[in-house]
Amino acid sequence: MNLLPCNPHGNGLLYAGFNQDHGCFACGMENGFRVYNTDPLKEKEKQEFLEGGVGHVEMLFRCNYLALVGGGKKPKYPPNKVMIWDDLKKKTVIEIEFSTEVKAVKLRRDRIVVVLDSMIKVFTFTHNPHQLHVFETCYNPKGLCVLCPNSNNSLLAFPGTHTGHVQLVDLASTEKPPVDIPAHEGVLSCIALNLQGTRIATASEKGTLIRIFDTSSGHLIQELRRGSQAANIYCINSNQDASLICVSSDHGTVHIFAAEDPKRNKQSSLASASFLPKYFSSKWSFSKFQVPSGSPCICAFGTEPNAVIAICADGSYYKFLFNPKGECIRDVYAQFLEMTDDKL
């Protein structure tokens, strides 16, 4: 969740994002960065810079390396540089410079993937990074890109050169032709891989439909309806076994869908009437909850299989529990930016 160029809440938060298994989340601040354990909530690291802000933080699971990009009113680093921070040494150990602004960074143990506004560059994760690949994209100001964290799957997904298309590339064998998925007619707003890299979920700027595709064939598996009104989708994430997905939007709602068992999702009683528009046969979320503040948020599943966590731009942390019927209760609320080690 990128809150640049400005966060209306005035709390100094510029960016929030989960690590690869959603066990931690990192925050870029006007004065440094922070790392938290997701569930239970605990501040793990707080690095303050007197001289500047961090607009993007990318973790590599729980290891000591993080990718940082400068941001905010006074960026700590130039926005056209990726800095690899070693948290054991408390300093940057790798620096990669580009001719244009960096939109996002993705990491896996052997690769650094840098997203520019119409191009993606892949480097070795070594002390002197070597450029391996360059992929063209359509104009991509949100820096959409996902890299499968699974050690047996080197899949990289990003917007194709055609509007609404997703390109899937296997970084382990780039001689294979990429899989091109015409996911939506409109501009993409969100893409997400499951942890195994076998499924990709997509949403367009319209934000009413979530589509799930098989990554090896590119075939559509499911179409899920978030709502009837347009919305800006901030986040899509799946649980460990990819049976559920959660989706957050600017309507202040987090929806939970069954990704593998569509019968669990709600459907109109008019769904079987063939003469009615497709809308009536839509599969809706079986559970949803409202973030009380209505603030932009990212979401992920917690340590319990029936828990969903929401991390909000106003500094709020929510943990909701849902049951098989879709009933939802709030279990935990906290202000994560105000936490210190002595409070925990």
Swiss-Prot record:
Q: Is Signal among this UniProt entry's keywords? A: no
Report the source organism: Pongo abelii
User: Subunit notes for this chain?
Assistant: Interacts with the TSC1-TSC2 complex; stimulated upon starvation. Interacts with RB1CC1.
Q: What is this protein called?
A: WD repeat domain phosphoinositide-interacting protein 3
The UniProt similarity line reads: Belongs to the WD repeat PROPPIN family.
A cellular-component GO term for this protein: lysosome
Which cysteine pairs are joined by S-S bonds?
none
**This protein's record includes keyword Translocase:** no
Task: Quote the InterPro entries the UniProt record gives.
Answer: PROPPIN, WD40/YVTN_repeat-like_dom_sf, WD40_repeat_dom_sf, WD40_rpt
**GO biological process terms on file:** autophagosome assembly; cellular response to starvation
WD repeat coordinates:
183-223, 228-267
Q: Which GO terms describe its molecular function?
A: phosphatidylinositol-3,5-bisphosphate binding; phosphatidylinositol-3-phosphate binding
Motif residue range(s): L/FRRG motif: 224-227
Show the domain comment: The L/FRRG motif is required for recruitment to PtdIns3P.
User: Could you tell me where this protein is found in the cell?
Assistant: Preautophagosomal structure; Lysosome
Where does this chain mainly localize?
A: other
Could you list this entry's UniProt keywords, alphabetically sorted: Autophagy, Lipid-binding, Lysosome, Repeat, WD repeat
Biological role stated in the UniProt entry: Component of the autophagy machinery that controls the major intracellular degradation process by which cytoplasmic materials are packaged into autophagosomes and delivered to lysosomes for degradation. Binds phosphatidylinositol 3-phosphate (PtdIns3P), and other phosphoinositides including PtdIns(3,5)P2, forming on membranes of the endoplasmic reticulum upon activation of the upstream ULK1 and PI3 kinases and is recruited at phagophore assembly sites where it regulates the elongation of nascent phagophores downstream of WIPI2.
